[in-house]
């Protein structure tokens, strides 16, 4: 009864008002699975291709009708008759149909929408929640959230170079407690910013985006907010950064325009990070070096890799082949997992497994352009990832994922696990 009878895609809007893809997969039993595809603002060079129409007369060229047609006219007829429970077979069929390394024929957005909708339909068919269908009976660990409460870089129109300043409520005893702690710090930060006369408008991911005097002032106001909320920085709450340094890299140098000395070599940028790590309880730095600066990545890993989680996002783009290269060269110690960087659920699970076998931590992540789809919340629990990055404590597109995790925690009840600080198992 899990035989696929129809596959249908439509164009919808994401949280930034840009078109994206939604796919529905129908089974012989009458069951339907639906999934929507996210979209990034800062993207890695080697990400799978997000197919856009390029028609300036519609959505400023960002329409996805080509991807929609690829699902409805090409992919659908290939999958009708296949069993939805054959996730690997279905994903392989789509990869063969596309025939390119970066999914440039059909579009990774088209392929991913189908891949996720198939998994949702199959889970519904067998009567299991999505996280349990994907992960099995041992899928029960709720992730420590990495909450983006202050935005800069490509995620905000302000003068802060670093893209994301995040809090991690690592002292919490449960996911629900971590969420509450994060929300309280978020509201305290709004009060702190207002008190200093700063704008409290929010960026793409729900974090505040004020024009601060420096990158370090962002850390200072967050530290003040943590104290104002009644918590201890370094014990209850840890800090994390996403530098998105590929956006700052030009001609072999890094340019942080709002620093006293904007132009920095790789060594000078690592000095900058080391100084921040010594002054503030920073436990994680994402994309601290540019995606093509592998020498810089090796240097930062050698210097900070025992003290700080060094997350490769643009560096690895959820690609098992690139991740294996990084592991062999000893760069980074963690990988950010974004479903649409690679384009199928099967390949995503392969990347997670590869990382775990090498002792790399895994962080399941949203994109700046999100929808109400909550698949990544289920994925985080399915693979016992330990960490999730899904934005701030406002905007429904972000909060939807947190609320889904609350439901999962409630459903798991006493079997639910939450490791807090222990998710950083490879730091000593």
UniProtKB/Swiss-Prot annotation:
Active site: 205 (proton donor), 338 (proton acceptor)
A UniProt-annotated Pfam family: Enolase_C
Keyword Protease part of the UniProt annotation: no
Binding site for Mg(2+): 242, 286, 313
UniProt keyword Secreted, yes or no: yes
Gene Ontology biological process: glycolytic process
List of residues binding (2R)-2-phosphoglycerate: 163, 338, 367-368, 389
Free-text remark on how the cofactor is bound: Binds a second Mg(2+) ion via substrate during catalysis.
Pathway entry: Carbohydrate degradation; glycolysis; pyruvate from D-glyceraldehyde 3-phosphate: step 4/5
Protein location: Cytoplasm; Secreted; Cell surface
GO molecular function, one term: magnesium ion binding
The entry's keywords: Cytoplasm, Glycolysis, Lyase, Magnesium, Metal-binding, Secreted
Predominant place of localization: cytoplasm
EC number: 4.2.1.11
One CC-aspect GO term: phosphopyruvate hydratase complex
Catalysed reactions, as listed in the record: (2R)-2-phosphoglycerate = phosphoenolpyruvate + H2O
Cofactor(s) it depends on: Mg(2+)
NCBIfam families on file: eno
Function: Catalyzes the reversible conversion of 2-phosphoglycerate (2-PG) into phosphoenolpyruvate (PEP). It is essential for the degradation of carbohydrates via glycolysis.
Name the record gives this protein: Enolase
Lineage: Bacteria, Pseudomonadati, Thermodesulfobacteriota, Desulfuromonadia, Geobacterales
């Amino acid at each position: 009864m899990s035989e696929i009878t129809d596959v249908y895609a439509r164009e919808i809007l994401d949280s930034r008002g840009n078109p994206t893809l939604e796919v529905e997969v129908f089974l012989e039993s009458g069951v339907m699975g639906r999934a929507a595809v996210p979209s990034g603002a800062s993207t890695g060079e080697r990400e799978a291709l997000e197919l856009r129409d390029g028609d300036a007369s519609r959505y400023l060229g960002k329409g996805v009708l080509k991807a929609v047609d690829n699902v409805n006219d090409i992919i659908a007829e290939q999958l009708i008759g296949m069993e939805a429970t054959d996730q690997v077979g279905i994903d392989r069929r789509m990869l063969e149909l596309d025939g390119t390394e970066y999914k440039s024929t059909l579009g990774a957005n088209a392929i991913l929408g189908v891949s996720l909708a198939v998994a949702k339909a199959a889970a519904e068919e067998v009567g299991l929640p999505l996280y349990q269908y994907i992960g099995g009976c041992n899928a029960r660990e709720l992730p420590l959230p990495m909450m983006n409460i202050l935005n800069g870089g490509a995620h905000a129109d302000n003068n802060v170079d670093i893209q994301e300043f995040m809090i991690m409520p690592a002292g919490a005893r449960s996911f629900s407690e971590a969420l509450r702690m994060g929300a309280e710090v978020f509201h305290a930060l709004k009060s702190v910013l207002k008190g200093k006369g700063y704008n409290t408008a929010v960026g793409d991911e729900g974090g505040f985006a004020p024009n601060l005097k420096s990158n370090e002032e962002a850390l200072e106001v967050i530290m003040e907010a943590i104290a104002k909320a009644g918590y201890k920085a370094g014990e209850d709450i840890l800090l994390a950064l996403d530098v998105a340094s590929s956006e700052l890299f030009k001609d072999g140098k890094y340019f942080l325009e709002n620093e006293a000395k904007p132009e920095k070599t790789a060594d000078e940028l690592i000095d900058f990070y080391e100084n921040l790590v010594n002054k503030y309880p920073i436990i994680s730095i994402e994309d601290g070096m540019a995606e093509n600066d592998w020498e810089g990545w090796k240097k930062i890993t050698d210097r900070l890799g025992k003290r700080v989680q060094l997350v490769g996002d643009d560096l690895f783009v959820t690609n098992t082949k690139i991740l294996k290269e990084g592991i062999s060269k000893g760069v980074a110690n963690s990988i950010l997992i974004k479903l649409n960087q690679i384009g199928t659920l099967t390949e995503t699970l392969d990347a997670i497994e590869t990382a775990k076998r090498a002792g790399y931590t895994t962080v399941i992540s949203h994109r700046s352009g999100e929808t109400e789809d909550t698949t990544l919340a289920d994925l985080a629990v399915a693979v016992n990832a330990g960490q999730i990055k899904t934005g701030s404590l406002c905007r429904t597109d972000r909060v939807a994922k947190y609320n889904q995790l609350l439901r999962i925690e409630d459903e798991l009840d006493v079997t639910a696990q939450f490791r807090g600080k222990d998710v950083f198992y490879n730091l000593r």
